[in-house]
A protein has these predicted regions:
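Walker A/P-loop-proximal flanking segment of P-loop NTPase domains
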Residues: 1-81, 91, 219-237
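Short loop/turn segments at strand-loop or loop-helix junctions that form parts
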Residues: 107-110, 156-168, 204-207
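Conserved P-loop NTPase catalytic core
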Residues: 102-116, 188-237
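Conserved lysine of the Walker
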Residues: 86
Length: 237
């Protein structure tokens, strides 16, 4: 029997013992901020070391088609179990969007402060300012649509939304909470994106709520699924 390593030759960094465990911790936000390891930050190195599954290839093709204005799903949910490659898929789309001359807006819930807002981040990334999107109340669909429409083709990538919404649930906004405002915003966002022919929204949710979340987070998880599920297509990379 032929030894496996003569058929599947390991990368040089594995053979040289340079591969460390932190390289496996894919982080879309660190890529967006330019602070990730080169294996993720450099598009050439990233795709050299990425095995492109049929699911990932199909996902990239659908997103490219949408950004070109040639149809395709406007809202996509990437759903995998923990460690199933969803963040890796988002990073692949992030790099490909640059090849497709598309603008990119990135939201990752983990590093966000509880009082930060997704709409504020969008405005800041697309225009350099949060003017008109500074408050803790969801801005409304028309204002959001105007913002997105002015920056097409546009790829919006959202990861760890449940993590952020759980934190935002503790921030009061009048008789509401920032988590409730975020849910209203996500509904506005999915509806606005559906009306724009060269904008694609890709959002990740875990395939099931993780054990370390409490009952409040489980309710948010179900609400997020309900909001996103109205106009989305689910893909597994």
């Amino acid at each position: 029997m032929t030894a496996f390593h003569t058929i599947a030759v390991p990368h040089e960094d594995i053979l040289a013992g340079r591969l460390t465990l932190d390289v496996f911790a894919a982080d879309l936000w660190e890529v967006h901020k330019g602070r990730a390891p080169d294996e993720y930050l450099d598009p050439v190195r990233f795709f050299q070391k990425t095995y492109q599954t049929e699911g990932l290839a199909n996902l990239l093709a659908v997103v490219e088609k949408r950004l070109q204005g040639a149809g395709g799903d406007p809202v996509i949910q990437v759903q995998t179990p923990f460690g199933g490659g969803k963040t890796h898929a988002l990073i692949a789309m992030y790099h490909k969007a640059a090849e497709w001359d598309a603008r990119r807006a990135v939201v990752v819930g983990t590093p966000m402060a509880p009082t930060d807002t997704i709409w504020g981040l969008f405005a800041e990334q697309l225009t350099g300012s949060r003017a008109g999107f500074e408050g803790l109340t969801a801005p409304g669909r028309e204002a959001l649509r105007d913002l997105l429409s002015a920056h097409q083709p546009l790829l919006i990538l959202m990861d760890e939304v449940l993590e952020y919404a759980t934190k935002a649930a503790g921030v009061p906004v009048g008789s509401s909470t920032l988590a409730a405002q975020t849910l209203a915003f996500l509904q506005e966002l999915t509806e606005a994106v559906a009306t724009l022919d060269r904008t694609c929204l890709v959002v990740t949710l875990p395939s099931s709520v993780l054990e370390h979340y409490d009952e409040g987070a489980e309710r948010l998880f179900r609400q997020l699924q309900k909001v996103a599920g109205r106009v989305e297509k689910i893909y597994t990379p």
